[in-house]
């Protein structure tokens, strides 16, 4: 049965989608069975895996709202499988209001897919609305990317408050898988200070691997591929390979 991990931080620009795409590809390269569930209407994770976000049908929106079979929506790529998204997902939170047990729609879909995978990663939207609540209800744990910049921890208190509410009433088993430092630059005091502050806030929960600031990580999505394929010898690719080893070791 799959380890279902939501990659979540409502603050935009922290490397959430980059992390979801590249950890999927890195674990696939280790021989793991991996599914990326794109739960963001921008569908950048879908296109980052080489899937055309404008033509995929059925997709995760159809699964949630129109009752499409989850397995029929899955697209296989050489980097891992994808449950794709598209812009229709933007209105899903409003459409969910009338659906009974709406917080668990994604959970029910992923339960059908989980026996086929070792890992399922959910790329969450940059907000704390019903789609994110669905992801938190479906996940067993959370991977929280934190950018090594000023105000890095801003908004995390809101995320943690939402997590506490979900644990109390909807998903008591939810835990933090790990906190990932992204866009790290060892040459700056700021990155080092942020890293220390994050470790103080999340003792024992911060990954040893840090993701460096790396231009190849920024370029790869425009080519529709993970950085591991775009530039396998880049510092970004090496960091995600190390993170995959770290996550894999946690689950052995």
Task: Tell me the role of every PLM-derived stretch.
Residues 1-252:
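P-loop NTP-binding core
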């Amino acid at each position: 049965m799959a380890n279902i991990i939501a990659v979540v931080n409502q603050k935009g620009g922290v490397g959430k989608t980059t992390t979801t795409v590249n950890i999927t590809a890195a674990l696939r390269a280790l021989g793991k069975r991996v599914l990326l569930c794109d739960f963001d209407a921008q569908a950048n994770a879908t296109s980052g895996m080489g899937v055309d976000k404008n033509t995929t049908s059925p997709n995760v929106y159809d699964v949630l709202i129109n009752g499409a079979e989850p397995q029929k929506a899955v697209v296989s790529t050489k980097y891992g499988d994808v449950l794709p998204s598209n812009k229709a997902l933007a209105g899903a939170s409003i459409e969910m209001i009338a659906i009974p047990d709406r917080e668990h729609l994604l959970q029910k879909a992923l339960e059908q897919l989980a026996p086929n995978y070792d890992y399922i990663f959910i790329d969450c939207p940059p907000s704390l609305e019903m789609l994110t609540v669905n992801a938190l209800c479906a996940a067993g744990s959370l991977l929280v990317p934190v950018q090594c910049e000023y105000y890095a921890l801003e908004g995390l208190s809101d995320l943690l408050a939402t997590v506490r509410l979900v644990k109390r009433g909807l998903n008591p088993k939810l835990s933090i898988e790990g906190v990932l430092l992204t866009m790290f630059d060892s040459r700056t005091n700021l990155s080092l200070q942020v890293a220390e502050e994050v470790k103080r806030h999340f003792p024992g929960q911060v990954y040893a691997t840090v993701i460096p600031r790396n231009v190849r990580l920024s370029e790869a999505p425009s080519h529709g591929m993970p950085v591991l394929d775009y530039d396998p010898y880049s510092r970004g690719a090496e960091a995600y390979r190390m993170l995959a080893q770290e996550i894999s070791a946690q689950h052995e």
